[in-house]
Amino acid sequence: MASPAAGTPPFLTKTYAMVEDPSTDETISWNDSGTAFVVWRPAEFARDLLPKHFKHSNFSSFVRQLNTYGFKKVVADRWEFANDCFRRGEKHLLGGIQRRKGSGTGGAGAAPAGGIPTAIPISSPPTSSGGEPAVSSSPPRGAAGIAAGVSGAVAELEEENARLRRENARLARELARARRVCDGVRRLVSRYDHDHGGGEEEAGEGDVKPMLFGVAIGGKRSREENGEDEEEEEEEGADEDGEDDEVEEDDEERERHAARRVPVREGKVRRTTELSDLDVLALSVRAAAAARPGGASRDRKSSVS
C-alpha cells in the first residue's frame, strides 16, 4: 500500500472534508460501515456544497472526477461511491488513490469496466446497470417536488376554470329567463294601460263599461239604451204638450161657463166665481205650465182666445 503523500490531490481532500462534516450529513455522509459515502440529496449537494468547495455546481462533473480517481458506484438505487483507500477515520490512506492516466489503461486504483456513469442529469432518477429505473431510498429531489407541485397547481387551476365556466353558463341562462319574464310583464302593462285608457274615455261619454280580457263589453247595449231614452223623452214631451193643450181648452171652457153665471145689476158688473176642487187643480196646472219654457206664450194664446 502506498504511503500517504504530501501532495494529495485537492479533490480528494475536499471530498473527504465534506463527507466528514457532521453538519452536512443530511446531504452527504458515510454509510453505516464507513467504507463508502452517500450523496443523499444530489440537487442540494450541487446547489450548496459544490460551489463552496469546487467553484462549480455540476454534479455530473463531480461524478466524472470520482470515476477518474477509481471510485465505483456500489448500490444501484442511490448515489453511493466507494474506494479502497477512502474510509472513515483513515484519511492517511488518501495518498494511495492514484489518478488514472487514460481511459484505456488500468492500475491498482483503476475503475472496473462497468464504472461510474458520468453524464447523468441531476433531475433524472438513478438507474441500474440494465438501464431500468431503480427504486431510491433517498429523500425526494427538489426538482421532482417542484414539478409535482406545479402539476397539482395546474390541475387545480383547470378544475377551477371548468367550474367557473359552468357557473357562467348557468348565470347566462338565468339572465335570459329573467329578460323573457321582464319582456312579458312589460307587454302586459302596456296592454293594460292601452285598454284602461280607452275605457276611461268611453266612460266620460256614457256609463262605465265592464272589461273582458281587455275588451270593453256592453257598448251596443248602452247605445240602444240611449236611443230608447231619447224616444221616451220625445214621447213624454209630446204627451206633456198634448196634456197642456187639453188643460188649456178645459180652462177656457170653464172660464166661459163662469162668465155666463156672473149677474149684471144696475150698471155694476159683479163677477162671482164658484171654484171647485177641479178648478183649483186646473189653476195649479196652468201655473206649472206657465213656469215651464214656452209657458208664457201659451198663456198669451189663452188670453187671446
Swiss-Prot record:
A motif (Nuclear export signal) lies at residues 275-285. GO terms for biological process: regulation of transcription by RNA polymerase II. Keywords: Coiled coil, Cytoplasm, DNA-binding, Nucleus, Phosphoprotein, Stress response, Transcription, Transcription regulation. Its main location: cytoplasm. Exhibits temperature-dependent phosphorylation. Residues 164-193 are annotated as: Hydrophobic repeat HR-A/B. Gene3D superfamilies: Winged helix-like DNA-binding domain superfamily/Winged helix DNA-binding domain. It is found in: Cytoplasm; Nucleus. One of its GO terms (cellular component) is nucleus. Transmembrane segments: none annotated. Transcriptional regulator that specifically binds DNA of heat shock promoter elements (HSE). This is Heat stress transcription factor B-2a. It comes from Oryza sativa subsp. japonica (Rice).
